[in-house]
Amino acid sequence: MDATKIKFDVILLSFLLIISGIPSNLGLSTSVRGTTRSEPEAFHGGKFPAMKMRKLMAPNMEVDYSSDYYDGGSSSSTTSPSPPVPDYDDIYRRQGDVPSPGIGH
């Protein structure tokens, strides 16, 4: 019975020693460092110039585009006149090419 108790104690002690030694071997020690350095400085040992951080800016979704469109009978408070409808026949005449009506017209 004493032999099994000793074996268990030895196994438990060796297990605790291994577990307590692994974090320091892997650099995962939980002790607080005396100097605080950034991760690149800690790994590469040196000072690096400050890098400019990019910010992702959300577009302004509250822009009023109502003046871009005119629906004719809108009940909006703005009373902007509708743009004149272009005379396409006049445009084609100026170019010397009046479109003929399609088949069946």
Curated annotation (Swiss-Prot):
The molecular function terms of the Gene Ontology recorded here are: hormone activity
Give residues where Hydroxyproline occurs: 99, 101
Region feature Disordered, mapped onto this chain? 68-105
- GO biological process per UniProt: nitrate import; regulation of root development; response to abscisic acid; response to brassinosteroid; response to salicylic acid
What range does the record give for the signal peptide? Answer: 1-29
Q: Which UniProt keywords apply?
A: Apoplast, Developmental protein, Hormone, Hydroxylation, Secreted, Signal
Q: Which residues form the propeptide?
A: 30-90
Gene Ontology terms: cellular component: apoplast
Please report the PTM annotation for this entry.
The mature small signaling peptide is generated by proteolytic processing of the longer precursor.
- Subunit field text: Interacts with CEP receptors (e.g. CEPR1 and CEPR2).
The beginning of the lineage is: Eukaryota, Viridiplantae, Streptophyta, Embryophyta, Tracheophyta
Q: What function is annotated for this protein?
A: Extracellular signaling peptide that may regulate primary root growth rate and systemic nitrogen (N)-demand signaling.
What induces or represses expression of this protein, per its UniProt record?
A: Induced by brassinosteroids (BR) but repressed by abscisic acid (ABA) and salicylic acid (SA).
Q: What is this protein called?
A: Precursor of CEP15
UniProt record similarity statement: Belongs to the C-terminally encoded plant signaling peptide (CEP) family.
Biased region (Low complexity) positions are 68-80
The superkingdom listed in its UniProt entry is: Eukaryota
